[in-house]
């Protein structure tokens, strides 16, 4: 491309482009497409000005041959191509002599006939898209915009094209020639795509057939076809009175647009009340694993066999007792349920052959814990038609809960590294195309950053538990099946490891609809004393079941081992999504990929390697009361993954609503930061919609608190 530019353009233009790139610290050897774009833009600016003069009568004339007798003044002052200091000097001088308003950005030309600055654009995309980008950036009614494309299209402010047709045709022909020359050398595709930094398949996307008819049918009133509507939108003056424009569009609209300033937004109000409680389906940072390394026992891989093998590694069992009761439950039933599990596991061990699955005896404590016979009787609606006061039973409003520090601790823990590897590198065969090579490289770098992450452990744990529970719900509908909570990983040395977190006992599960609920009792090992944060464990009955010897720097120490027991429930659709938690890896990888793409687009080459290997660079991770938190690229990967995993673990209607509504406020704040002068109407209604979602969910409350930190720092 560099050779082509030096052959194709006048040496003076090439020299000016080199200077411009040097001034902005850009390397023309690397950013060759940018080099070509600057040369093209300079040439169009010079061609725009060439041969245009103002005669003694003040008329604009075109003179192609030098006539030394004519007293002619150049019609256009060329600003583009000068160094910044000189360019601003020229602009200031013009403003002082003509009284023109000083522009915010350096324009390309000044037209002495029309007394206006001109911004010239040369685009490889649709002219109207580029025009809108320019208009949004400049935000000035005094600077005239004129856009040319390589396909012969053009667009100008108020369709005022300034020059005569022949002069414009000369510019279009030159652009078309540059395009042809590039295409002949195989440079055009790369040049065209580099403007937006992503691949586009069609140069011009024409709508035809059914889609075209639908487009014409779905236009607002008073527009006969899509072209008319496009022209109206392109000519829409954004600085006009928006209220007036709105009322033109529809008689029903009556909106008062208020300017959105730095002082406009207020913090989101978080609810007051007792602290929020843990509501995930399994323990996260508080979970304890009983593990076996290099499992090679008989029946290895069969969950019940693995569980019994893990249970045998622990010798500190003791008579269980309740240390933190569940306030509303019959706690003795939870205690009896655990004793029953231990007893039935011991019974299995005395059998000659361990069964593949274990169904628990339907004791009174398990029937109570699993809500057996507690569901109200269903009656066919036709049999109730004659009952005059038939109504849905009243349900209490949920109690408001306040944010508690434990959920931030949970999130921080999810971002940390463990000493185990939770996902393997998938081998997908040899790469064929270059894009596959880049994709594999990105996947491998990303996997290396997150394979040890605790959030990845939660993914594998969630996938296992949900898969096992859904299988059991379908295969043993009437049974109280015992399901071990298991995960598998590798140690740093590469040895296989099987972990047992505890057990689930499933209730009756005749799941016809996606939302039908299956009840289960979870019993999970932990070293966390529930009395330290009793509000977190509101839904749990916690037993002390043993003492565990732990090795530390100062020798061995004994810690009490707890069992967190609770009744819970889930549905087919929730289990289906739980089984697909690996998608969180994909979502966070795509977010990282878009960061790499943005970087690659600026540098005009793939930046994957530099992105992951430049360990010194700090990236923004998130907002906290202290300000913008920064960290390594690995930390960014793990934080994005943890957010995605928590969205899955704490999925709820409150989260859906908060995400959708707070996003609107976020976009307005970002527009303000980008100096786009946003306006809003019914901002109070938006706040109401956001705050309506803040009820009792810990993850939503934490996100709202983060959002407030963002508002504080974004509007400083």
Curated annotation (Swiss-Prot):
Subcellular location per the Swiss-Prot or TrEMBL entry: Host cytoplasm; Host nucleus
Cofactor note: Binds 2 manganese ions per subunit.
Enzyme class: hydrolase
Alphabetized InterPro entries for the sequence: INFV_PA, PA/PA-X, PA/PA-X_sf
Binding site for Mn(2+) 2: 80, 108
GO annotation (BP), single: symbiont-mediated suppression of host mRNA transcription via inhibition of RNA polymerase II activity
EC number: 3.1.-.-
Chain span(s) of sequence motif Nuclear localization signal 2 (NLS2): 184-247
Pfam family, any one: Flu_PA
Chief localization: host cell
Cellular component, GO annotation: host cell cytoplasm; host cell nucleus
Cofactor (UniProt): Mn(2+)
Any one GO molecular-function label of the UniProt entry: RNA binding
Residues bound to Mn(2+) 1: 41, 108, 119-120
Keywords: Cap snatching, Endonuclease, Eukaryotic host gene expression shutoff by virus, Eukaryotic host transcription shutoff by virus, Host cytoplasm, Host gene expression shutoff by virus, Host nucleus, Host-virus interaction, Hydrolase, Inhibition of host RNA polymerase II by virus, Manganese, Metal-binding, Nuclease, Phosphoprotein
PTM section of the record: Phosphorylated on serines and threonines by host kinases, including human casein kinase II.
Chain location of the short sequence motif Nuclear localization signal 1 (NLS1) per the record: 124-139
Record-stated family: Belongs to the influenza viruses PA family.
Functional note: Plays an essential role in viral RNA transcription and replication by forming the heterotrimeric polymerase complex together with PB1 and PB2 subunits. The complex transcribes viral mRNAs by using a unique mechanism called cap-snatching. It consists in the hijacking and cleavage of host capped pre-mRNAs. These short capped RNAs are then used as primers for viral mRNAs. The PB2 subunit is responsible for the binding of the 5' cap of cellular pre-mRNAs which are subsequently cleaved after 10-13 nucleotides by the PA subunit that carries the endonuclease activity.
Quaternary structure and interacting proteins, as annotated: Influenza RNA polymerase is composed of three subunits: PB1, PB2 and PA. Interacts (via C-terminus) with PB1 (via N-terminus).
Official protein name in the record: Polymerase acidic protein
């Amino acid at each position: 491309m560099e050779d082509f530019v030096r052959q194709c353009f006048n040496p003076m233009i090439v020299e000016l482009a080199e200077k411009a790139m040097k001034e902005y610290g850009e390397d023309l050897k690397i950013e060759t497409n940018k080099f070509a774009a600057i040369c093209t833009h300079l040439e169009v600016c010079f061609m725009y000005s060439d041969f245009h003069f103002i005669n003694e009568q003040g008329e604009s004339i075109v003179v192609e041959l030098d006539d030394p007798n004519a007293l002619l003044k150049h019609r256009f002052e060329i600003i583009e191509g000068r160094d910044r200091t000189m360019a601003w000097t020229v602009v200031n001088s013009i403003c002082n002599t003509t009284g023109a308003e000083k522009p915010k950005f350096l324009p390309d030309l000044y037209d002495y006939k029309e007394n206006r600055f001109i911004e010239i654009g040369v685009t490889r995309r649709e002219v109207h898209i580029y025009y809108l980008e320019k208009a949004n950036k400049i935000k000035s009614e005094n600077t005239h915009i004129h856009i040319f494309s390589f396909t012969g299209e053009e667009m100008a402010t108020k369709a005022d094209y300034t020059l005569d047709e022949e002069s414009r045709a000369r510019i279009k022909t030159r652009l078309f020639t540059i395009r042809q020359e590039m295409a002949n050398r195989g440079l055009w595709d790369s040049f065209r795509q580099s403007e937006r930094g992503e691949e586009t398949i069609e140069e011009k996307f024409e709508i035809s057939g059914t889609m075209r008819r639908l487009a014409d049918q779905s236009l607002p009133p008073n527009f006969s076809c899509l072209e008319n509507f496009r022209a109206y939108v392109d000519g829409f003056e954004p600085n006009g009175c928006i209220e007036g424009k709105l009322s033109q569009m529809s008689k029903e609209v009556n909106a008062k647009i208020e300017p959105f300033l730095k002082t406009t937004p207020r913090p989101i109000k978080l609810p007051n009340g007792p602290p929020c409680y843990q509501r995930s389906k399994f323990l996260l940072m508080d979970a304890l694993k009983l593990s076996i390394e290099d499992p090679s026992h008989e029946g290895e891989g069969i969950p019940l066999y693995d569980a019994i093998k893990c249970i045998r590694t622990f010798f500190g069992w003791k008579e269980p007792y309740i240390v933190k009761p569940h306030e509303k439950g019959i706690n003795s039933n939870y205690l009896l349920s655990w004793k029953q599990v231990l007893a039935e596991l011991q019974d299995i061990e005395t059998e000659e052959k361990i069964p593949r699955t274990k169904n628990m005896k339907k004791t009174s404590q398990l029937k109570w814990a699993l809500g057996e016979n507690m569901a109200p009787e269903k009656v066919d609606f036709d049999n109730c038609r004659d009952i005059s006061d038939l109504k849905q039973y009243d349900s209490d409003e949920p109690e408001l809960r306040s944010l508690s520090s434990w959920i931030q601790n949970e999130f921080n823990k999810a971002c940390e590294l463990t000493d185990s590897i939770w996902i393997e590198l998938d081998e997908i065969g040899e790469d064929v195309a270059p894009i596959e090579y880049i994709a594999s490289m990105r996947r491998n770098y990303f996997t290396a950053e997150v394979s040890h992450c605790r959030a990845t452990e939660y993914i594998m744990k969630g996938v296992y538990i949900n898969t096992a529970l859904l299988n059991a719900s379908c295969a043993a509908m009437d049974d109280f099946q015992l399901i071990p909570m298991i995960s598998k990983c590798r140690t740093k040395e590469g040895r296989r490891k099987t972990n047992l977190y505890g057990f689930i006992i499933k209730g009756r599960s005749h799941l016809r609809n996606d939302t039908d609920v299956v009840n289960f009792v979870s019993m999970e090992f932990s070293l966390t004393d529930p009395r330290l944060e009793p509000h977190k464990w509101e839904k749990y009955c916690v037993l002390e079941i043993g003492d565990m010897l732990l090795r530390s720097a100062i020798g061995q120490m004994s810690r009490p081992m707890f069992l967190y027991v609770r009744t819970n429930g889930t549905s087919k659709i929730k289990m289906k999504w739980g089984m697909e938690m690996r998608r969180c890896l994909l979502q966070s990888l795509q977010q990282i990929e878009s960061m790499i793409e943005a970087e690659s687009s600026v540098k005009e080459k793939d930046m994957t390697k530099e992105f992951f290997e430049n360990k010194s660079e700090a990236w923004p991770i998130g907002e906290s009361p202290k300000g913008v938190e920064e960290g390594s690229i690995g930390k960014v990967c793990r934080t994005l993954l943890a957010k995605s995993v928590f969205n899955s673990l704490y999925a709820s209607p409150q989260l859906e609503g908060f995400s959708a509504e707070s996003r609107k406020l976020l976009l307005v704040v970002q527009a303000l930061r980008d100096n786009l002068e946003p306006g809003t109407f019914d901002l109070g209604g938006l706040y109401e919609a956001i705050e309506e979602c803040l009820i009792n969910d810990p993850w939503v409350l934490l996100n709202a608190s983060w959002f407030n930190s963002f508002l504080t720092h974004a509007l400083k």
